Amino acid sequence: MVGDADESSQDIIRSVTEAQQRGCEVIRPGVKASEVDEACRSYLADKGLADYFVHGTGHGVGLEIHEAPWINSKSSEILKEDQVVTVEPGVYLPGVGGVRVEDTVLITSSGFRRLSSAPKDSIV
């Protein structure tokens, strides 16, 4: 965010940040990629924002910047230890703007480790 965010914008930023955290918390070997998407998507739906989350939640990163496993509602791919994926839910309001919160994470034997270290608070 550049500039001062009104309360409504701050709520959206908090909602997308929390959705992203919930998606990360699902990550571990053996989980379907679609479950990560569902964790993000269901939280945003509870906040009334489902119609504004119009893309998948993430993807693998390896030899290509965008590759399998694809993290979206239709993915049947199973997450594996040592894969690197992004978790990047976003909400886009026509005529207002959008918010996307993204981390790149390593799938570990017990869950995940964030590889990105950007702060989650707004940049003013």
PLM segments and residue spans:
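Active-site neighborhoods and metal-handling regions in enzymes and metal-associated proteins
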Residues: M1-V124
